[in-house]
A protein has these predicted regions:
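Beta-alpha junction/loop-to-helix N-cap segments that form part of ligand/metal-binding clefts
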Residues: 24, 29, 33-35, 48-54, ...
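Short helix-capping segments at alpha-helix termini
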Residues: 65-71, 122-125, 193-199, 246-253, ...
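General small-molecule cofactor/ligand-binding pocket signal
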Residues: 75-79, 201, 278
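Extracellular/periplasmic Venus flytrap/periplasmic-binding protein
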Residues: 90, 135-136, 143-247
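Extracellular/periplasmic periplasmic-binding protein-like sensory domains
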Residues: 244-281
């Protein structure tokens, strides 16, 4: 099994739990065990970034820590959130109310990450988002028991957008994921673009898990924008880039900027498809 880019964050989530336990001389845990739940994408567009790799790395972290804290064994469970906030909330509620969950991690999608964080915090259970990127996790919907680990949409959007505009990419058209994450990426990038004298000519929203981006890319191509910004991630980004290559968008003179990209994505695409791509990581 290959260890994916977001996996080290999940490992860190498992290791952070001792900090809470060490605060007391006699820490108490559910049913005399430390129960960690990895709620992740096992079958959807983010499975290659999270999924089974998340679970494997969390288990590695537990093993490396000796499998116990203060003599209390650590148990790991996992589930597929199916990219649905209601499914995630139901699973989290079951874990907390029935099993006495101590920490829920993973949550690699903003809408469900926010939903589970709110639910868990109301029950005084820690969540550590390692994949969701919405700034609302620590902003408007900040929760006492919620931890947002790693990046957020402000950081990744601002870095790429600023560099591309400074390099001459003044006019933009966005192809964004049609949920909180995509909207946030586009909004954050737009602020930077406009602050630097650039313009956003338009944008379209593609449903999460889209396989055919042709209609969205044709609109972007027809906008004559200098830069087509991809405000998505995972297989959505890969599918959009493969089809952009088929349409000859970069060869035609437009730039493509991916706002969230990992080196493993570049490897998956291959150099002929990825060349000319603008991104920061």
């Amino acid at each position: 099994m290959k260890i994916r880019p977001l996996v080290p964050a999940v490992a860190a989530a498992a290791l952070c739990l001792p900090l809470a336990g060490g605060a007391a001389d006699n820490p108490k845990f559910s049913r005399n065990e430390i129960l960690i739940g990895v709620l992740t994408d096992m079958s959807g567009p983010y499975a290659s970034l999270t999924g089974e790799g998340d679970v494997a790395a969390a288990q590695l972290a537990i093993d490396e820590f000796g499998g116990k804290i203060h003599g209390v064994p650590i148990k790991l469970v996992s589930a597929d959130h199916q990219q649905k906030a209601d499914v995630s909330s139901a699973r989290a509620r079951e874990w907390i109310d029935r099993d006495g969950m101590d920490l829920i991690t993973g949550l690699g999608q903003s809408a469900l990450g926010l939903a589970v964080q709110g639910l868990a915090s109301s029950k005084k259970v820690i969540t550590m988002n390692t994949g969701a990127g919405s700034p609302d996790l620590t902003g408007s919907q900040c929760a006492k028991y919620g931890i947002h680990y790693s990046w957020n949409t402000h950081a990744v959007a601002v870095g790429t957008a600023a560099a591309v505009v400074d390099g001459g990419g003044k006019s933009w058209f966005f192809v964004a994921a049609d949920y909180t994450f995509g909207k946030s990426l586009q909004d954050q990038a737009t602020k930077v673009i406009e602050s630097k004298g650039g313009k956003v000519l338009g944008g379209v929203r593609a449903p999460l898990g889209t396989s055919d981006f042709s209609s969205f890319l044709l609109q972007a191509q027809g906008s004559k924008a200098q830069v087509i910004g991809l405000a998505n991630a995972g297989s959505d980004t890969l599918n959009a880039l493969k089809q952009a290559n088929e349409f000859g968008i970069v060869k035609g003179g437009q730039k493509v900027a991916a706002l969230l990209m990992f080196i493993t994505d570049v490897h998956a695409l291959g150099l002929p498809v990825a060349q000319g791509l603008q991104f920061t990581t």
